[in-house]
Amino acid sequence: MDKLIPDNVLPYPLPPWEHDYRVLAVFGEVEEAPLQPLVPPPLKLCSSTVQISVMYFDSSVPTEPYYDAAVIADVEYGGIRGGFWIHGYTSTDLVHAGTREIWGYRMKRGDDWSLGGDGEHYSGHVARRNKRLIDIKMTVTGKEFKQPKLFPRLFLKLIPHASHAQAALKKVVVMRAETTAVTVDLKGEARLSMAPSLQDPVADLAPVKLLGANYIEGHQVLPWAEEVDV
């Protein structure tokens, strides 16, 4: 650990984080009107295609396994195109704090999770306040479809002053997740449901057209990232 950060102060480990992962994702086109305002400057929206996913990480760093779920937009900054988490949910306090403070993820806690399948059918969901915000059911067909380039991840890491309404820290973070192995990569068709919620308006980005779905397993490292002052 950097000795500028006293030992035992942070409630999470510093990068690199490492895990085996499982991801169930559906890709779709959404209305641009509700999507555009959710992409903060200086990031720029590249298309109206989003990824909506439920993920499970059998993690070695941190040591506790966890779930994530997200709506990820296709954005660009400084000639770099990647994925920005419009909405994000996770299952542990440690990941909630660590991903926000290190890389700038936008996270809330999810209350109820599932992700599984049998090689032909897969399903996954996240619920919060008794509402299934994302519920995906996929049937494996092998049908190919066009996917946007959503790696690297692009985040706006913003922390406000405690004394007034201005940013104490504001940077674009380019995080190049290192996928070292992909052991399962299945494509198919999906059904997606998104429960309306005033507190969690994920359903405002329900796709008007589904493009396809995939289920992936592999191994990944979340490294230190590049920070750009804005």
Model-derived features: where do they sit?
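Generic structural motif
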Residues: V30-A33, F57-S59, E76-I80, R129, ...
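Generic preference for flexible, low-structure residues
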Residues: P42, Q51, V61, D68, ...
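Aromatic- and glycine-enriched beta-alpha-beta binding-site module
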Residues: F57-K137
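Intrinsically disordered, low-complexity regions enriched in small/polar residues
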Residues: L14, H19, V23, D58-S59, ...
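A broad, low-specificity signal for short, low-complexity segments enriched in glycine/proline
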Residues: P13-L14, V30-P37, L45, F84-W85, ...
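Interaction-surface and assembly-scaffold signal
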Residues: M1-D7, E101-V230
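N-terminal domain-onset segments
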Residues: M1-Y66, S193, P201-L205, Y215, ...
